[in-house]
Each structure stands twice: as C-alpha cells, then as structure tokens.
C-alpha cells in the first residue's frame, strides 16, 4: 500500500535514491550528504527512510520522534521525501526489502546511499549480494576510507560498479551528538536549527 506522498510522486523521473539509516538523530552531515547526492547523481527524487526495527542495534529515540525530526528538516527541500515505509511494513527492517519496494514503485534500479564505514561489514548485511544486484551502491566519505575500501575489495571483489561520492568527509555521528546532549553541551552546528532545541532536550534527559 502506498503512502500519500508516494502516490503523488509516481509521475516523477526514474533517477531515484534511497537514503536509509537510524537518524538517531538526523544531523547536519545527513543534510550535506543529501544535497551532494541530489546534485552529483542528478536525482529526480531522494527518499529518506528511517529504520523501524534495525536488525543489529536498537535506537534511542522512538520511530515517531525520528520521523518527525526528518520531516521538519527535509520536507521543504526540493526533490526530497521522507518515507515511513519500514514502519508500515513492520518486522525487522532489512534494506533489501526497502530497495525492492521502491524499485517496484518507480520501475527502476535505485541508488542506495550508505556511509563509507558500512563497507567494513557490508558482507554481513542480509542478502547483501541482492542489494548489489538490485541497486547501485553509493558511498559517501566518512573518516579515513582506505581501510574500508581494502576490506570491501577483499570481500566484494570488483568495486567498479560502486559510486564513491566526491564530497567533504562527514566526520559527525549521531552517537557523538547524543553524548554531547547528555553532557549538556550545545548542538549548534551539529543538528539543523529547526530541531536543535528539541534534540538537546530529548537526549539531554
């Protein structure tokens, strides 16, 4: 079953990107990745998909709160969409199901955006080879990427089909933001201003 935003978007072009994650919370690095991804890949639409029930870790903020923050941050941005698909689907949130879902809706092979650190354990992802077949993997830089690239090359082999984004390195992490908030430090510059105060209070406890 399609959401309202998905139904209204079916007449868009076929260059579709999927940007999944816990977004616990969404931060300025996520916004940077979105802007560069839209521009570099010339996407018709970038769909941000917060995880509902992650297979390997638990989130701190509930889905509804993370989804609300994402809507506040991205709703006014052109070609951006925030989807609650993984909550509507229910069960464990495996990326391959999300890829297959949007691939069927838009009748295209989508771009699937992940951080560079994901390359260090990508072979542990559920049906990871299907992810590589059914989407074009797009990797944005985080920290020092060389060890991740070497590991991915050993495990995955040819990386020529993977798109590595040429953009500033994303140094910030949601874990760091939660810790700063816990210590009562400002999150100015770390999270978008639209949600900063709310995020500081929520994780400040």
Swiss-Prot record:
Superkingdom per UniProt: Bacteria
GO MF entry, a single one: ATP binding
Catalytic activity from the UniProt record: nicotinate beta-D-ribonucleotide + ATP + H(+) = deamido-NAD(+) + diphosphate
EC number: 2.7.7.18
Pfam family, one: CTP_transf_like
InterPro entries, per database record: Cyt_trans-like (IPR004821), NadD/NMNAT (IPR005248), Rossmann-like_a/b/a_fold (IPR014729)
Coiled-coil residues: none
GO biological process: NAD biosynthetic process
Keyword line: ATP-binding, NAD, Nucleotide-binding, Nucleotidyltransferase, Pyridine nucleotide biosynthesis, Transferase
Pathway membership: Cofactor biosynthesis; NAD(+) biosynthesis; deamido-NAD(+) from nicotinate D-ribonucleotide: step 1/1
Enzyme's top EC category: transferase
Entry-linked HAMAP family: NaMN_adenylyltr
PANTHER family: NICOTINATE-NUCLEOTIDE ADENYLYLTRANSFERASE-RELATED, PHOSPHOPANTETHEINE ADENYLYLTRANSFERASE
Family statement drawn from the similarity comment of this UniProt entry: Belongs to the NadD family.
Function: Catalyzes the reversible adenylation of nicotinate mononucleotide (NaMN) to nicotinic acid adenine dinucleotide (NaAD).
Entry protein name: Probable nicotinate-nucleotide adenylyltransferase
Native organism: Thermotoga maritima (strain ATCC 43589 / DSM 3109 / JCM 10099 / NBRC 100826 / MSB8)
């Amino acid at each position: 079953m399609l959401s309202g935003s998905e139904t209204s978007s079916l007449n868009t072009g076929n260059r579709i990107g999927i940007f999944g994650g816990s977004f616990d919370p969404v931060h300025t690095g996520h916004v940077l990745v979105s802007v560069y991804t839209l521009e570099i890949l010339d996407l018709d639409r970038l769909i941000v998909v917060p995880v509902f029930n992650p297979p390997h870790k638990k989130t701190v903020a509930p889905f509804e709160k993370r989804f609300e923050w994402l809507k506040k941050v991205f709703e006014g941005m052109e070609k951006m969409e925030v989807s609650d698909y993984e909550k509507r689907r229910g069960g464990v949130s495996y990326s391959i199901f999300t890829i297959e879902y949007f691939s069927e809706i838009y009748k295209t092979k989508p771009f699937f955006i992940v951080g560079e650190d994901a390359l260090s354990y990508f072979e542990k992802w559920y049906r990871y080879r299907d992810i590589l077949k059914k989407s074009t993997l797009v990797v944005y830089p985080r920290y020092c990427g060389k060890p991740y690239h070497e590991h991915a090359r050993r495990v995955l082999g040819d990386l020529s089909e993977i798109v590595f984004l040429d953009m500033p390195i994303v140094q910030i992490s949601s874990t760091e933001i939660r810790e700063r908030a816990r210590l009562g430090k400002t999150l100015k510059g770390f999270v978008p201003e639209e949600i900063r105060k709310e995020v500081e209070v929520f994780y400040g406890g």
